[in-house]
Amino acid sequence: MIEIYTTPTCPFCHAAKDLLRAKSVLFEEIVVADPDKRAAMSARVDGRTSVPQIFINGTHVGGCDDLYMLEETGKLNALLAINTGD
């Protein structure tokens, strides 16, 4: 399961979602424009308030740059294996 915390106007959120869509994986988007949802996200990611925040199979992988780094180093497909059927 992939969870991505986003806001509607965040370009990094859009880039992260674009990469996940290109990988043909399903994800749950949690929009944190509401202060209560953002506080819940922040508590889950050790106080971070920036978006996106991405979880793959319950593991926090970081933000957009972290997701693209996983892709560049060839590690993203392995993390997504459960979701892609690889």
Where are these regions (language model features)?
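Thiol-based oxidoreductase modules, predominantly thioredoxin-like and allied folds used
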Residues: 25-38
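Short, solvent-exposed coil/turn elements at secondary-structure transition points
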Residues: 10, 33-35, 82
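Local sequence-structure signature of Cys/Sec-based thiol-disulfide redox active-site neighborhoods
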Residues: 1-26
